[in-house]
Amino acid sequence: MPIDYDKIKNWPFPDVEQSYSEKDSILYALGVGYGHDPMDEAQLRFVYEKNLQAVPTMAVVLGYPGFWVKDPASGIDWVKIVHGEQALRIHRPIPASGTVIGRTRIKALVDKGKDKGALLIQERSIVDKKSGALLATLEHTTFCRGDGGFGKGDPAPPSPPAVPDGTPDATCDLPTLPQAALIYRLCADNNPLHADPAVAKAAGFARPILHGLCSYGVAGHAILKTWCGYDPAKLGGLSLRFSAPVFPGETIRTEMWRRDGNILFRSRVLERNVVVLNNGVATINP
């Protein structure tokens, strides 16, 4: 069944209310690798309840509407979808605990053509329930490889900026734990691809892979450490394109260039010298 453009654009997302505790914030931080140096007081502020602060990229696991594309009524061939890009704008620091409302809408549905797939762009607003303040806005771009050719769609979004040539202005190497995917799945995505060796093998991988949004959090850590002095209020936004999977236990090197007040970056795994995150842009607040 082909995609029905109007049905998808008007998909009835309910508001998602989510309460979370300081333990949840600590678990997310541990999942994306904070605390790997337990003597680093700058990292401890995200993994120890004394003066606890939330990692800014934790917004990606709040107010999640669920895996709705699996609903047969969507017409989407969910088996063939790939998480292509992720963007985050942070309007206010994420509280270390609280209750938020996630409000999701379909921002765009782009028909790339028959046999070329489609782009599905979801926008999610994260609102603090108590104050009504907008905390963050997320864009999740999904490449629907089996769903092109429905004949109606929105204009394609502009391509993200390319990473500069030449030597980066800064690099940051961060390790991932062999059990990182098993920790991160407790925060959000419990897809067995990230835990079950048999499922990973059936999908064509030698072993379970790391969640893309966990790798995203590691890149955010590199930006926060290198350009923000671990001050969450200084990170205004983070966008990137996923280009290859990461295996838990690999080391992620983030290469960064300062351009026009932003940080352009990409990340590669050192063990295989493969770029895994690309076309990254981080906005740094004054």
Task: Give the label of every model feature segment.
Residues 2-47, 155-215, 222-225:
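A contiguous, surface-exposed recognition patch within enzymatic or periplasmic domains that forms
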Residues 1-99:
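Hydrophobic, proline/glycine-rich low-complexity stretches
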Residues 46-48, 83-84, 90, 96, ...:
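Generic structural "secondary-structure junction" signal
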Residues 198-276, 281:
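Catalytic-pocket segment enriched in acidic/His residues
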Residues 39, 129-133, 229-231:
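Intrinsically disordered, low-complexity coil segments
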Residues 1, 58-61, 78, 138-140, ...:
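Short, mixed-charge, low-aromatic patches
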